[in-house]
Amino acid sequence: MKTNKENEPQLLISFRDIKEISDQNFKYFDICDLKDPEKGSIGAWEEKNILNVVKRCKQRVRVSATIGDIFSVEGIIKKLQQFDNFGLDYIKFGINTKSVLELKDLINRIGKFIFRTKLVLVVFVDKNSTLKIIEENLEIFYQNNIRFLILDTYQKNNQNLISFYNPLKIKDFINKCSIKKINVGLAGRLQPNHITKLKLLNPYVIGFRSAICSDQNRKFLSEQKLIFLSNQFFSNKSNAIESAGA
């Protein structure tokens, strides 16, 4: 159950449809993330269901939603403007490019609009060329009102975030982003055994989906696994540090 202290990482749980969300479970996480893996790596929910969840739980947890696997500049901006009217706390969008010019064009164009909702760029660590140009151009995000990046995996197979990006590299990335006043989240088939190590890196948020599912395809949520994960995540931080050093 949540016992978060200020400046500690937040727990994000991804839900694939409205049937998975129970009012009794809000106490186990900080951010309710609406993402349908059946529709893509960052597949989007239907608008009516997003609005329903926002109405139900906005006063109890924060709500984020993904816009879908849309990677064209025009498509992303259109979806960001649409989702900005939903009352969300965060809107997550991805980018899939090897071009610095395309990255800068997208981010600069986003910066011309005023969004009420916090924008979160999903950075796919298994797409090395995209990750590299983002890391080399961090200054453009803060300048254009994007203060949140989340490291994730695009391909949802047996590999996870740490398979592609070890904790030392993650810490270095978080430090670079901190200098630019950008918050970093971590996700990508993470499991309970990753919690201690990743919390010590002090990300803004750590996200889970696979870890709370009863099947390998991430289709069926297990409430028992959710409770176990929450207990692991919100256990005393000093105990986590002690365990890491043991």
Indicate where each model-derived feature is located.
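Conserved anion-binding
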Residues: 60-77, 86-162, 176
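Catalytic cores of alpha/beta
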Residues: 18-26, 67-85, 129-140, 186, ...
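N-terminal entry module detector
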Residues: 1-41
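Active-site-adjacent beta->alpha loops and helix N-cap segments on the catalytic face
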Residues: 39-56, 72-76, 97-114, 130-133, ...
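Hydrophobic faces of well-ordered beta-strands that scaffold small-molecule active sites
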Residues: 9-15, 30-34, 61-67, 91-93, ...
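C-terminal alpha-helical cap/extension of soluble enzyme domains
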Residues: 182-246
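Glycine-rich phosphate-binding active-site loops on the catalytic face of alpha/beta enzymes
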Residues: 31-42, 86-100, 148-158, 201-224
